A protein has these predicted regions:
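Short hydrophobic helices that act as membrane-entry/anchoring signals
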Residues: 2-31, 178, 182
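Active-site and donor-binding regions of nucleotide-sugar-utilizing enzymes
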Residues: 24-212
Length: 212
């Protein structure tokens, strides 16, 4: 997989591997200071603290509180339509974990997202083996996306948003932008401006979708 990647992505993958232990140490302080059980710190290394449920599993990745709540609305609708489906939601903040703990519907599990190291992401995917992956808004971690795609797991980006400044930055590395955005089979944007930005970055299939 790495041989076909733009140089910038290959460099990022190598750097992420090197700095992952330091990033985990930094995260440890933030999470434990906000009342999270220290046993859950291993989730940031991709080590699960819950078993994978049987059957089809849909994974939602959300950055923080707002994205997590948006995910829950969609999960509730999908769960009502398909009683056999199970769900996993990942997020990166202690606040989102506390809120989700009070609001998780049946058949839904929360874990902290693995830090964006190839090793940590592979551990995570080895355990959870999701059948589909849904990323919410703007949380696009390259290794998480690339490792998921490498396993043939369909990816969707919903409620996508991107600022003018971020779009301009991505436009300076067009091969990298295309390499990441092309992994998504479905990209639904919050508004026309965002859809135009994504299309200009190489995601011709990006379109305005329902706002979560």
């Amino acid at each position: 997989m790495a041989d076909a990647l733009p140089l910038l992505l290959r460099a990022y993958r190598a750097l992420a591997t090197l700095v992952a232990p330091l990033a985990h140490h930094t995260t440890k302080t933030k999470i434990t200071d906000q009342g999270i059980d220290c046993k859950r710190l291993r989730e940031r290394k991709g080590i699960a603290t819950q078993p994978r449920p049987k059957g089809e599993l849909m994974w939602f990745h959300a950055a923080s509180v707002g994205e997590s709540l948006s995910s829950l609305r969609l999960i509730n609708a999908l769960a009502a339509a398909d009683p056999a489906r199970t769900f996993l939601i990942t997020s990166g903040t202690a606040t989102s974990a506390h809120i989700l703990a009070k609001r998780l519907p049946p058949r839904c599990t929360h874990q902290f997202a693995p830090l964006d190291s190839p090793l940590y992401v592979r551990r995570f995917l080895n355990h959870w083996q999701p059948d589909e992956a849904v990323f919410i808004e703007s949380e696009l971690w390259p290794n998480m996306i690339l490792e998921t795609r490498a396993r043939g797991i369909p990816l969707a980006l919903l409620n996508a948003r991107i600022s003018d400044k971020t779009a301009a930055s991505w436009s300076r590395v067009p091969r990298t932008a295309r390499a990441l955005l092309s992994t998504f089979r479905l990209i639904h944007c919050q508004d026309t401006r965002t859809a135009v930005h994504f299309q200009a970055l190489g995601a011709a299939h990006a379109a305005v979708g329902p706002n979560l």
